[in-house]
Amino acid sequence: NLVDKKKKHYSAAFRQYWKGVGGVDDKLGAIEFHYVEGVLPGYFWIFPIGNGISNVGFGMALADIYKQDKKLKGLQEFVINGRFADRFKNAELIGGSSKGWQLPLGSPRRTSTKPRRAFGNGCMLIGDSASLVDPFTGEGIGNALLSAKLAISFFDKIVDRNGLPLEKGKKYQRKLWDTLGKELTNSFKLQNYTRRKWLVNWFVKKANKKQELRRLLTESLTSREAQVKLTSPWLLFRHLVF
């Protein structure tokens, strides 16, 4: 399963750099995620990168883009010129900053090698080539660095100078999923939650009233422990019903 031909486990993202977006604080450094009516299950983000410049983008699972037959650039323009028009009225798009790409997600598959086969004769795959992008946040740098560290631990430049044995590749694959599997699986669950408009609205309303739930939602972007709690059926039932 080296190639995901149907693109079931891919997201697409479109990014621009804007200067002077209203309500953005360089010092605070807050990352904003917005789930906007009319473009769900996609999400819109804004975060500062310094000197009054913001990274502004839009992301959506590739399968959902195909279903809706939409372009991410058009969806982002719809959000900026509609719901966020006031915040962008004095902002300036930085020329040449528009870029789109596909993200190979680390969501679990029904295969023996998860998330996808990451080894072959004489090689190990790391980062995006191993499909390690977080399905919920779209972040991939941390997992790429971790996979590189794991790959190095299985390779000896003297012993393996004529090529990496398949058995070592298999061990690397198992260690990779043992290390990242739970986190990626929980992120996949969170990604699926955002496909249900009523659940997103209900969850956000409850989070506005409950500090603990609001904290978990914020920490889920960076904390494995918070993601585990947030995908617990009992915790969700307790917070969302009572």
Predicted feature descriptions by range:
Residues 46, 118-121, 164:
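A generic short alpha-helical patch detector that favors 3-5-residue windows
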Residues 23, 38, 54, 108, ...:
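Short capping/connector residues at structural and topological boundaries
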